[in-house]
Amino acid sequence: VKFNKELVQLVANKFEVSKDDAYSYCVLFFRTESGINNLIDICKQYGKSEKEIEGLMENE
């Protein structure tokens, strides 16, 4: 799974971890609805709008 680079960077900043670790965190977050909600909350904490969050949450 490929995640949006900005989303991975936000997770890295939030948890003060490397981008590689942040990628692993994203894998775990996307496994559950509550995890996805946590990612949305992280995006909101960094001032992202609903539209920006939708774009960030799209993965390839």
What label would you give each PLM region?
Residues 1-33:
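Amphipathic protein-protein interaction modules
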Residues 34-60:
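Long, compositionally biased
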